[in-house]
Amino acid sequence: MKYISMGAVTKPSTEHIVYVSHCGFDYTLTGDLASMWLNGRFGFDSARNQFQKKALNQLERMGLVVITEDVLEGEYRALTKVRLGPAKSRNPYMGLSRNEKTALKWITETGLVLSMAELVYLIERDIEPEVKYLGQDNVQRLVERIYTKDTIFDNILENQMERAEKRDHVVRLVLSLLKKKRIVLL
């Protein structure tokens, strides 16, 4: 049973007590809850015993983790259940590869919060983050570029991108940006 944590640390925390904010709610996590949340903060982890599974289920009820099955597309499926948000960073593009910079630019400079499926779509189609798609004034143009008659139906984009050739590449990019503290999962 794999999982990944959602939310952001709001106050200085330790490994024993963690202050997390997610969707307008503030949580104080201690003990196994804090440990499990921290272990999934920058990538996927798994519960190793019954106590951790119990803590993981409690975190899921709180909305602080997404649990997925241990299959190839499991990480992608989990990431489709979150929103990708920019983290506060002084020099967000410094030290990143070209592909990471492209993904980060899509995540941080569009006028909307992208889903994982939308990011996979943009990268799969080799659509560059040009000025005409970035910013609040260009949201409609970006939405029209992503959502066509073939992708507008409920969950069709998520399902199509699950079979995309670059799906795993984009999952690795997102996890790399998460580890480098350039994005947060909302």
Model-predicted regions and their roles:
Residues 25-186:
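Long, charge-rich, low-complexity alpha-helical segments
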